[in-house]
Amino acid sequence: MKTEIHPNYHSITVVMTDGTEYQTRSTWGKEGDKLNLDIDPRSHPAWTGGTQQVLDRGGRVSRFQKKFSGFLKKD
């Protein structure tokens, strides 16, 4: 196996949206870094049945809603 071509694989701490933490190994960040999640399987509408609102990051959701607001309306 070639040396020095693979990314550094190390332990990090992942912090879920509810504050729980778990250890995993990743190529993200540096050894011991904390990855704070904005959305995770416990809070994402796709896994929770869609009862929670989707975060509008950068106005993407509002742009989509504006663009397709009248798409399924009957005259």
UniProtKB/Swiss-Prot annotation:
Tell me which UniProt keywords the record has, alphabetically: Ribonucleoprotein, Ribosomal protein, RNA-binding, rRNA-binding
UniProt cross-references to InterPro entries, sorted A to Z: Ribosomal_bL28/bL31-like_sf, Ribosomal_bL31, Ribosomal_bL31_A, Ribosomal_bL31_sf
**Which Cys residues form disulphide pairs?**
none
Q: Biological process (GO) annotations?
A: translation
Q: Name one GO molecular function term.
A: structural constituent of ribosome
Q: Which GO terms describe its cellular component?
A: ribonucleoprotein complex; ribosome
Pfam families under this entry? Ribosomal_L31
Q: Which domain of life is it from?
A: Bacteria
User: What PANTHER family does this protein's entry cite?
Assistant: 50S RIBOSOMAL PROTEIN L31, CHLOROPLASTIC, LARGE RIBOSOMAL SUBUNIT PROTEIN BL31A
Quaternary arrangement and interactors, per the entry? Part of the 50S ribosomal subunit.
According to its UniProt record, which protein family does this protein belong to? Answer: Belongs to the bacterial ribosomal protein bL31 family. Type A subfamily.
- So what does this one do? Binds the 23S rRNA.
Q: Protein name, please?
A: Large ribosomal subunit protein bL31
| Gene name of the record | rpmE
